[in-house]
Each structure stands twice: as structure tokens, then as C-alpha cells.
């Protein structure tokens, strides 16, 4: 899915799972942009990495922007103006969970799943393996890395899987 892709757009980019993936892909050399309904502390973190973040979700955010891949979560409805434009213009789209799987397939991945304790378990695992320099995307803030995600320098990838979107 990421072959022949340069410009990636995240609708709902301030979400904990979306922001982690956006930061990792930006660090990997992709041009990343996205939108959300409100600014959050993570917005500035992404802007500091060169990620363009639009506040508000309107067609103009995605129209004629050369988007190769549109990433969305279960929070984005078919009535969303950005989503509607992407569908009407046959731009490639992918759900957040599918993108996570696509990225993790390039690594030795560990995904933490379940109904309770995913964030705690994936965070503890991430801290325990920090010296192995893994890529990390979890559902909560990890004090040891001052983020919910980390660009790694190894073959390891730790993620929190979310049953709400089958990731």
C-alpha cells in the first residue's frame, strides 16, 4: 500500500493512534498532513516535525493537494467532507488499523490486544525494550519517551492493537 505513495493525509490526525502513525511516517520521509476538529498538545509536536495540521475538516483541506493516500479511523463518517471528496475522486484510502498492520509487516512486531490493560501493558513492554530501540505506537503517554510514539532504530515495532477497528 505504501509503494508509490509520497503524500499521506490523516483525517483525525490528533487521535492517539493516528498521531503516532503520522509521526513515524513523517520521520520515514513521507510528506504528511492531516486535520482534526480541535488543537491538542500533540498538534504542536507534529507541526514541529513539519506535519501540516488543519483545524476543521473541510473539502478544501484535501482538494487538489496531491494526496496519494488518505488515512481515516472509525471516528470519520461517510458524511465527512474530506472523506466524501476522497471517495468522489477515487483517491486511495485506508483505515488506521490496516495502515498499522501494513507498517508492522515490515518489522518484527509485537501487538498488545485485549479488552482491558492494553495501554498499560504496551507501555510497560515499550519501556522494558527501550534499549532495543523499537518503533512504538501506543494509546497513552509514556513518560520515559515523553510521547505515545517513538521513531525506532531497529527491526522491532511495538503497538497497541484496538479491537474497535480490528487493528
Question: Model features per residue range: what roles?
Answer:
Residues 55-57:
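A short alpha/beta connector and helix-capping loop motif
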Residues 1-52, 65-70, 88-91, 123:
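ATP-dependent carboxylate-amine ligase
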Residues 4, 24, 47, 60-65, ...:
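Phosphate-binding loop of NTP-binding sites
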Amino acid at each position: 500500500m505504501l509503494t508509490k505513495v509520497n503524500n499521506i493525509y490523516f483525517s483525525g490526525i490528533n487521535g492517539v493512534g493516528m498521531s503516532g502513525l503520522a509521526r513515524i511516517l513523517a520521520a520515514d520521509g513521507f510528506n504528511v498532513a492531516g486535520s482534526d476538529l480541535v488543537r491538542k498538545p500533540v498538534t504542536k509536536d507534529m507541526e514541529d516535525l513539519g506535519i501540516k495540521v488543519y483545524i476543521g475538516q473541510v473539502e478544501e483541506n484535501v482538494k487538489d493537494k496531491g494526496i496519494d493516500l488518505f488515512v481515516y479511523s472509525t471516528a470519520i463518517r461517510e458524511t465527512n467532507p474530506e472523506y466524501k471528496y476522497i471517495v468522489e475522486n477515487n483517491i486511495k484510502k485506508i483505515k488506521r488499523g490496516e495502515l498499522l498492520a501494513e507498517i508492522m509487516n515490515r518489522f518484527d512486531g509485537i501487538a498488545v490486544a485485549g479488552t482491558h490493560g492494553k495501554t498499560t501493558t504496551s507501555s510497560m513492554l515499550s519501556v522494558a525494550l527501550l534499549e532495543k530501540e523499537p518503533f512504538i505506537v501506543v494509546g497513552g503517554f509514556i513518560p520515559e519517551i515523553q510521547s505515545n510514539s517513538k521513531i525506532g532504530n531497529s527491526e522491532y515495532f511495538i503497538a497497541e492493537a484496538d479491537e474497535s477497528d480490528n487493528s
